[in-house]
A protein has these predicted regions:
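Metal-associated gating/positioning segment near the N- to mid-region
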Residues: 1-33
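Divalent metal-coordination and catalytic microenvironments
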Residues: 19, 36, 84, 113, ...
Length: 305
């Protein structure tokens, strides 16, 4: 537990050092609650629920519900919001998705990691990928082979079929392997997207169709993922790298510094349904102000991007 707390503190300090004052974290422990409270950061902490065996879903939900209630009592404040999240789609029985939505009951924010990698896509749609090679070993004692696979549909349609989008405040993380039909479904359900492009690039997961999301008028924010998946939680590096990745893919030169900055500020606020409180410097909003020092030699000349 102390290692989790120390890790959360370090991650929070690194985020603050690059100007991040609000974080969204998916976790199975309360370490992030303690750490962000200690650091005075604004946060949405999602309690993750995971169970591959249908027989363990109710137990997993009861455990998560107990943690949510405990965290709300201990940490709930204007700075800290508690939510709930389904585990990775390749490690969850689909009943988890509908149970999470039922429990949230349009009052708790929901997060999910979806369509992150080609391996996940193939596992869900075709039942064949590196995940399927090890699934018997990974889930021995629960189920030998997930009986619902292959589904023949994309991860987004899979989630849709199980009611995973039937809530008012959903944050979908990654959304890399998404087709036009998937995008329309995400937009129709007003699902917010958190793109984590450095993580996707470092792990060879692919490139999200960011420009398509923006053109569709969807709520999109920038995420850094965690230091376990990227070298840092520096939002300035995330903005610059993300823009260059999209340009290199030929997905639109309209992405400029202003667009990326907007996604890192107001975009993130909208994705978390906090645009009335944070994301811009306006009368009536919280004064989460970041000062950027441009006096260093590495900032001369200042480039754009």
């Amino acid at each position: 537990v102390s290692d989790w707390y120390d890790s959360a503190i370090l991650g929070g300090l690194e985020a603050l050092s690059s100007g991040i004052t609000c974080v969204a974290e998916i976790t199975a422990t309360g370490a992030a609650c303690t750490a962000t409270q200690k650091l005075g950061m604004r946060s949405v902490i999602y309690r993750e629920v995971g169970a591959m065996d249908k027989r363990r879903v109710d137990f997993a939900m009861r455990s998560a519900a107990a943690d949510v209630e405990k965290w709300q009592e201990e940490y709930g404040s204007d700075l800290l919001t508690i939510g709930i999240a389904s585990g990775p789609f390749f490690a969850c029985h689909p009943l988890v998705f509908s149970k999470v939505v039922e429990y949230a009951d349009d009052t708790l924010p929901i997060a999910m990691q979806i369509a992150a990698s080609r391996e996940e896509y193939n596992f869900i749609k075709r039942g064949s990928s590196p995940f399927s090679v090890h699934k018997e070993e990974l889930h021995r004692g629960y189920v030998e082979v997930p009986p619902w696979l292959p589904t023949g549909v994309t991860p987004v349609n899979y989630a849709l079929n199980w009611g995973a989008f039937d809530s008012k405040n959903i944050l979908a993380v990654h959304c890399v392997h998404v087709n036009d039909e998937d995008l329309e479904q995400l937009k129709a359900h007003d699902v917010a997207i958190a793109v984590c492009q450095r993580c996707n690039a470092q792990l060879g997961m692919g490139v999200p169709p960011l420009t398509d999301y923006l053109r569709a008028g969807m709520r999109v924010g920038l995420g850094t993922d965690s230091p376990a998946a990227t070298d840092s939680t520096d939002m300035f590096i995330e903005m610059r790298t993300g823009m260059l990745i999209q340009r290199a893919m030929g997905r639109g030169m309209f992405l400029d510094s202003s667009t990326m900055l907007e996604m890192a500020t107001m975009g993130g606020a909208r994705a978390l349904r906090m645009e009335d409180k944070i994301g811009s410097l306006e009368v009536g909003k919280h004064a989460d102000i970041v000062a950027v020092d441009l006096s260093g030699s590495h900032q001369t000349p200042t480039t754009d991007p």
